[in-house]
């Protein structure tokens, strides 16, 4: 049986979210992101049906893992909009960023691949040139790409710590929060 925190979501789009609804949305999106992180990590450590024809499936799964990790972080940021949660979650985000300093660069390059593919002046990371976009390695644990390294086990642990920070807010949320 699945357990969910009981907060009524507001249905009118013209009203700002209550604190309880903001925490609920953050928590819901973080749970989704954690599932995606675990899914991508599992796929990276297993054989998949398409592997025989698509030998770079691991590359795509790593790119999806990067997106899921950044989405987890962005989902946690929602909780910082609630004053009673701001400090604990902001500290957890700071720790997440310290544990995964390469994540933003990897996400930026992956998300703005069109700029990097042509060495556009709009690139945030000028050290990343078009020739390095499809050059990297993965040893089953560590992904090396664009001069950065991402250990998928360390990334999962950092994700769990961030998720646990928001979970502590959810667990301590007043039951009669008026929502």
What function would you assign to each model-found segment?
Residues 1-99, 125-179:
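Amphipathic alpha-helical interface segments
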Residues 97-121:
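Histidine-centered, metal-coordinating catalytic motifs and their short helical/loop contexts
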């Amino acid at each position: 049986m699945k357990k969910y925190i009981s907060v009524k979501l507001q249905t009118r789009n013209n009203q700002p979210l209550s604190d309880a609804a903001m925490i609920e949305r953050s928590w819901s999106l973080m749970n989704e992101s954690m599932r995606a992180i675990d899914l991508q990590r599992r796929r990276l450590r297993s054989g998949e049906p398409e592997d025989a024809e698509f030998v770079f499936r691991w590359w795509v799964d790593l790119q999806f893992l990067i997106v899921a990790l950044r989405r987890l972080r962005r989902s946690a940021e929602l909780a910082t909009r609630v004053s009673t949660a701001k400090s604990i979650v902001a500290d957890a985000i700071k720790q997440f960023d310290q544990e995964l300093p390469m994540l933003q660069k990897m996400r930026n390059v992956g998300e703005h691949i069109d700029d990097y593919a042509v060495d556009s002046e709009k690139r945030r990371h000028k050290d990343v040139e078009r020739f390095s976009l499809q050059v990297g390695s993965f040893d089953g644990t560590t992904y090396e790409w664009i001069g950065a390294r991402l250990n998928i086990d360390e990334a999962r642990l950092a994700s769990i710590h961030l998720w646990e920070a928001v979970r502590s807010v959810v667990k301590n949320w007043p039951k009669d929060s008026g929502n």
